[in-house]
């Protein structure tokens, strides 16, 4: 809200369906590609600061590429390169999957729904096939993921028109009403972005202390653990010292050590942990955001979805009707992803009006 020309809080929408007001002495706008939309709620006029850039990855069966290490390949006729990364080792020197990415293209479509289109798939596969001896086709693509980078828009005199050439530096701004906005940056500089944004908020508050992120360990990073079993290696690698919580779940119910999705390394206890410790509130949260199941093997994940839904339903208080709704939403998301891969970027944007 705005009171005495100062923003004093936000109206929040939380799952499943509720809105509530939150008061605060300082509001930080760290909303990525939506940052300009949020600024518009605070300021009557402001320049657009965001230039969205889309990046996509594809997943294919490892046998189609057979790389035993992560490699970087050039993109023909483009000043870019792609990573080709093997994933899920089988223990005999081979892997289950290889994922390839990422792209970097201007994006003019709906920021709420960036999808991997036929153009994206063709771009990645053309680059891959120029560097491998096998022929990888669209039929081999079993998973995709896409997202938008909130790049800082360059000044009008910038020479290059490519998003790949834009700076990945971040920018922190404060509005006349005291809203701190942080834009730009990238995943690997998230701590520095947070530090600069919090330090700016501290100035507004008149506080002398600065952000402490430099001295804070990551979640689960309280000491190295020597692992012995395959299960230990997986859970310790994913959760660090927090793996003890998941091992306790398995001790109380050994069935939670079973695989969550066929062919993927995730266990049923991870779905439970996602709900109880990682704020997962939907089936899609568990299968797409807390684990990467849907991203790596959409078909297998869709097949496993009913059982996963049944597993987490008691933890979230879902009745049969809500379970059906969650499952229908997830299946629809998978279908929309399938459909997007069959159309060009232009056709996809046109379909959104």
What do the PLM-derived regions correspond to, one by one?
Residues 31-33, 44-46, 60-66, 74-77, ...:
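C-terminal accessory subdomains/tails of enzymes that are appended
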């Amino acid at each position: 809200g705005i009171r005495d020309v100062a923003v004093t809080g936000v109206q929040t929408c939380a799952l499943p369906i509720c809105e509530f007001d939150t008061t605060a002495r300082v509001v930080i706008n760290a909303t990525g590609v939506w940052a300009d939309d949020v600024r518009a709620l605070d300021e009557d006029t402001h320049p657009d600061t965001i230039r969205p850039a889309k990046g996509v990855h594809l997943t294919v069966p490892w046998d189609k590429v057979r790389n035993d290490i992560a490699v970087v390949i050039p993109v023909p006729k483009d000043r870019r390169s792609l990573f080709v990364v093997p994933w899920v080792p089988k223990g005999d020197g081979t892997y289950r999957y290889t994922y390839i990415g990422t792209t970097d293209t201007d994006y003019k479509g709906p920021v709420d729904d960036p999808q991997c289109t036929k153009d994206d798939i063709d771009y990645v596969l053309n680059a891959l096939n120029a560097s491998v001896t096998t022929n990888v086709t669209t039929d081999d693509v079993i998973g995709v993921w896409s997202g938008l980078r909130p790049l800082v828009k360059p000044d009008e005199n910038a020479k290059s028109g490519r998003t790949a050439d834009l700076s990945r530096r971040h920018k922190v701004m404060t509005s006349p009403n005291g809203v701190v906005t942080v834009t730009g940056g990238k995943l690997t500089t998230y701590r520095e972005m947070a530090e600069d944004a919090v330090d700016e908020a501290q100035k507004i508050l008149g506080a002398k202390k600065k952000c402490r992120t430099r001295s804070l360990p990551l979640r689960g990073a309280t000491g190295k653990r020597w692992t012995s079993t395959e299960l230990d290696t997986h859970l310790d690698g994913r959760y660090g010292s927090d793996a003890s919580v998941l091992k306790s779940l398995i001790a109380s119910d050994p069935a939670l050590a079973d695989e969550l999705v066929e062919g993927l390394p995730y266990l049923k206890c991870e779905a439970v942990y996602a709900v109880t410790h990682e704020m997962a509130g939907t089936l899609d949260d568990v299968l797409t955001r807390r684990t990467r199941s849907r991203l790596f093997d959409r078909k297998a994940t869709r097949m496993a979805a009913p059982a996963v839904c049944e597993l987490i339903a008691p933890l979230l208080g879902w009745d049969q009707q809500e379970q059906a709704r969650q499952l229908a939403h997830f299946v629809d998301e998978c279908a929309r992803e399938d459909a997007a891969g069959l159309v060009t970027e232009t056709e996809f944007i046109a379909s959104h009006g």
